[in-house]
């Protein structure tokens, strides 16, 4: 028995090592529990430390349903969830690509709260096809994959950290960003905003049309903040320029054409009905 050889597979050894690491992290988390109010104060302090950081802390999306109603989607950006995870502490976060079928990339994000033992896993799909149906180059697939992983991690973190806390912090940071826009001058911030969007070949007229204004003089601080959220959503890969600025216009044009065609058909039908009734009346007199 003393000379008996025990074979341990690599998988079992790796599992034992991982379990040991996690057990150690859980023990440390319980030894140094978080102070929720202190965590919140730290989040706000870091997010509002610099004006640029505050602008980058949230995203803004608008989507229209089949009835034409606009739904506003807002939340913490990828950069802000990095601040959240650092301040919330005792989190174990991971992200990876789990599938690539040549058409879409699927990323997985995992977040485990070692203190409360709450864990979530989220998946995000991103297309890797051009508008003409060709597959992205190797480099572009890497870029899309990295963005998908970051978004999947963000979604997992937002599942683990209480949403009521995140919403409260986002609201405070947005208020500070709005205050800075007003103090520094709306027109000055508008020029900076237009300059940022030029990277995506978007003009000031396109931005004005998006916020529903006819001239830059009508732009408000709230409009600047909304565009900052849209810019963050495009930059981190939550949406695209085409989905936000081009597709809505195309859908609107198609809807207008369909409505015009329907009205034209209705008028033709009414004329045909009128002619038919006229002929019937004449025949009756005869």
Residue ranges of predicted features:
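Long, low-complexity, intrinsically disordered segments
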Residues: 270-286
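Composition-driven recognition of long, low-complexity, acid-poor segments enriched in small hydrophobic
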Residues: 258, 262-265, 269-272
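Polyanion-binding surfaces on beta-sheet-dominated domains and ring/shell assemblies
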Residues: 1-105, 110-258, 284
């Amino acid at each position: 028995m003393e000379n008996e050889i025990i074979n341990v597979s690599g998988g079992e050894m790796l599992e034992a090592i991982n379990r040991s690491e996690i057990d150690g992290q859980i023990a440390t988390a319980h030894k140094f529990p978080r102070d929720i109010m202190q965590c919140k104060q730290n989040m706000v302090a870091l997010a509002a430390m610099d004006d640029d950081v505050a602008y980058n802390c949230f995203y803004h999306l608008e989507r229209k349903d089949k009835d034409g109603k606009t739904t506003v989607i807002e939340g913490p950006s990828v950069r802000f969830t990095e601040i959240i995870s650092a301040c919330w502490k005792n989190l174990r976060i991971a992200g990876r690509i789990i599938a690539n079928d040549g058409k879409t990339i699927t990323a997985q994000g995992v977040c485990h709260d070692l203190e409360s033992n709450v864990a979530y896993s989220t998946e995000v799909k991103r297309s890797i096809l051009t508008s003409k149906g060709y597959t992205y180059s190797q480099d572009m697939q890497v870029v899309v994959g990295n963005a998908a992983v970051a978004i999947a991690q963000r979604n997992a973190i937002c599942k683990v950290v209480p949403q009521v806390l995140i919403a409260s912090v986002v609201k405070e940071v947005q208020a500070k960003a709005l205050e800075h826009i007003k103090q520094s001058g709306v027109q000055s911030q508008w020029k900076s905003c237009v300059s940022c969007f030029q990277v995506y070949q978007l003009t000031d007229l396109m931005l004005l049309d998006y916020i529903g204004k006819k001239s830059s003089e009508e732009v408000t601080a709230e409009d600047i903040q909304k565009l900052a959220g849209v810019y963050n959503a495009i930059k981190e890969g939550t949406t695209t320029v085409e989905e936000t600025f081009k597709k809505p216009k195309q859908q609107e044009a198609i809807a207008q054409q369909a409505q015009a065609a329907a009205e034209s058909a209705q008028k033709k039908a009414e004329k045909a009905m009128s002619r038919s009734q006229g002929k019937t009346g004449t025949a009756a007199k005869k």
